[in-house]
């Protein structure tokens, strides 16, 4: 690396183009802090103890990277590795216009639900996308599956619904937002975090990546966040509040601090913010109010 790594920064790497040239100004995050790469393409930060991924904000002039038919702009963190590099593919031109298709609450719980989604919803979505001109992207707004107090279907339903949502099936690059029914009641993924709210979403993160992230398309800054706060240490998705932790608010503050105020901001969550003030919802709205044009 052409930039010295400061003491205490145990998460770092370099962002380059396909020719190995450094790319400066790229926002990189561990889900708790946001930093920008320097002129050498280097980022560095102290790794948060609960961090699960390192990821970058996809710039408007770069392609959306895909893996297994899904956007993949992250790397899962290991216990010992400190360096994680990224290669960004240039886009031919920054889009002046694009379409964003929002899909809410598939709530797949059993095989018949999955069959209906594949046989009815997917063809409808593909048909709609075919009528749209220009670039088209998609984002769910949570509750991809339907876990409830008496039935946890994470392992049964999340893999097949993820396959049904691949670009080759659904006809667009589809990002994800987490809903309350996407929380795993009894997490099967080993997680040493003492924060049970984080542990409840780990299986979702294994399949779809970070729950709090952002990306840019055209003149829009699109933010996706998990606004589900589990209140039951048994990870019961029926026991929750809508809102954000202090750590999430700080992540959002840092993310938005690196966005021009005249950019369009599209804020995607599962539970509508409405007029509620508790659990940091008013704080989040106040952060968004700093921008001229916001859609929630």
Where are these regions (language model features)?
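Extended active-site neighborhood of metal-dependent phosphoesterases/phosphodiesterases
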Residues: 60-66, 71-76, 150-253, 259, ...
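Glycine-centered loop-to-beta-strand initiation motif
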Residues: 13, 37-51, 86
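Divalent metal-coordination and catalytic microenvironments
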Residues: 105, 138, 143, 179, ...
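Active-site-proximal beta-strand elements of phosphoester/diester hydrolases
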Residues: 97-110, 219-233, 266-268
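Long, structured stretches of catalytic cores involved in phosphate-ester chemistry, encompassing
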Residues: 262-296
């Amino acid at each position: 690396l052409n930039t010295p790594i400061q003491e205490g920064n145990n998460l770092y790497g370099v962002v380059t183009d396909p020719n190995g040239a450094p790319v400066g100004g790229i926002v990189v995050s561990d889900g708790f802090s946001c930093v920008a790469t320097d002129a050498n393409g280097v980022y560095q930060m102290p790794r948060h103890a609960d961090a699960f991924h390192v990821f970058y904000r996809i710039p408007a002039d770069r392609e959306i990277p895909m893996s297994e038919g899904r956007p993949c702009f992250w790397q899962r963190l290991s216990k010992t590795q400190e360096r994680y590099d990224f290669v960004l593919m240039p886009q031919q031109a920054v889009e002046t216009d694009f379409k964003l298709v929002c899909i809410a609450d598939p709530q797949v719980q059993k095989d018949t639900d999955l069959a209906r989604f594949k046989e009815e919803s997917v063809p409808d979505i593909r048909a709609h996308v075919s009528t749209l001109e220009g670039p088209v992207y998609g984002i769910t707004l949570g509750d991809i599956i339907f876990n409830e107090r008496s039935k946890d279907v994470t392992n049964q339903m999340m893999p097949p619904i993820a396959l049904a949502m691949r670009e080759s099936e659904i006809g667009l690059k589809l990002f994800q937002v987490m809903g309350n029914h996407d929380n795993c009641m009894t997490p099967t993924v080993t997680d040493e975090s003492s924060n049970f709210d984080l542990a409840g979403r780990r299986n979702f993160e294994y399949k779809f990546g970070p729950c709090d992230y952002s990306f840019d398309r055209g003149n829009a800054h699109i933010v996706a966040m998990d606004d589900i706060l589990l209140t039951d240490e048994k990870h019961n998705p029926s026991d929750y509040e809508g809102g954000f932790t202090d750590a999430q608010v700080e992540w959002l503050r840092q993310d938005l601090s690196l966005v021009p105020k005249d950019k369009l901001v599209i804020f995607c969550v599962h539970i509508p913010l409405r007029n509620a003030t508790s659990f940091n919802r008013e704080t989040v709205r106040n952060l968004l109010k700093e921008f001229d044009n916001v859609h929630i």
